[in-house]
Swiss-Prot record:
Region ranges (Required for tax-6 interaction): 176-181
Family: Belongs to the RCAN family.
Subunit structure: Interacts with tax-6 (via catalytic domain); the interaction is calcium-dependent.
Protein name according to UniProt: Calcipressin-like protein
Cellular-component GO terms for this entry: cytoplasm; nucleus
Pfam families per UniProt: Calcipressin
An annotated Gene Ontology molecular function: nucleic acid binding
GN (gene name): rcan-1
GO biological process: calcium-mediated signaling; positive regulation of nematode male tail tip morphogenesis; response to hermaphrodite contact; thermosensory behavior; vulval location
Amino acid sequence: MVADNSEKSTKSVANGSLISTVSSKDDLPNAIIVTQVPEDVFDNKQDKANFSSLFTQIEKDIHFDFLRSFRRVRVIFSSPENATAAKLIVQGFSFKGHELKAFFAQRIYMSANSQMLSPPPLEKQFLISPPCSPPVGWEQTKDMPPVVCNFDLMARLASFAIDEKYEVHNGDELTPAIIVHPCETPIDVPSAIEMPRTPRPSSPCEQ
């Protein structure tokens, strides 16, 4: 009795899982795959039309996928009820001496979320060549002018006119004026300081 109860509970669990998986009508398959299809169906237009009429009598607007390499045909219906009716008709049906077999095909769900890589966000897309229209409200930034020291500029200009004096800072009531009087470097002044040479130490032979 214990074994029977466990077996019944196992069946109930299995049935419960089966019911939960097909609780929605959208989970049922709406397509079948017909196997052992004669080669004449793929080559002869009339045989293909006769084969298609087996399913168009159930539903007119259906889709066929003729898989010649596998000798199979996938038939997609609009509802699971029509797919079930077509499977019952085709299963064991003899067509041009070949017994057809059919089984349900897995339902294909078209997802709106693409698994492909998406383009970059729009805030920097206008910087990519070729440039496109910038976003609304975007304004061109102005570059800051170069910072030039007046003292350095005046010193550079004064180097070209040695004989002329130039005023670095204008004097006012609180600070005196700064005037630079350039002068030429005397010719006899050495350009560099001479460093004394270190004598070479004597060798043992010289001693």
